[in-house]
């Protein structure tokens, strides 16, 4: 029952940056976000980018998000500098008035200009959204994986309606096993 109006990530989940995070290797885990309101920010609920220790088991439900200054609803950001395994993200019953960019954004190429050792490919798996409505955004789902499709997989959006999507579509690259079941964008059923 909290309201977030931060101008940055409304809720930011982290587990350490680069070598420090890998040294400790303790994932953030078992977080429930329920009955919250998110307004201005880079993302409503965000995992990363300092997520080198990993993350598992996020439950987000019954939340409202709405602002022309809210960039994304659910955001996962990491890179080959950070690494980490991010898994088991469950989101349901979310009402969004508007967001600037995308309802779901997964980005494995965050801050690609950072000078670092890039031998730590991250994995994002088991991310599931159900019963999410959004009345305005630029895209529905935006996934920026790596050059292959082995690091982002088992992603689903189900029983959801995204209206007034400016680009009228999703933009998914570098991912496999993406399921869109009963997802409507601008009133049209999205074919898998």
Q: Which role does the model predict for each range below?
A:
Residues 1-192:
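Extracellular/periplasmic carbohydrate-active domains that bind, remodel
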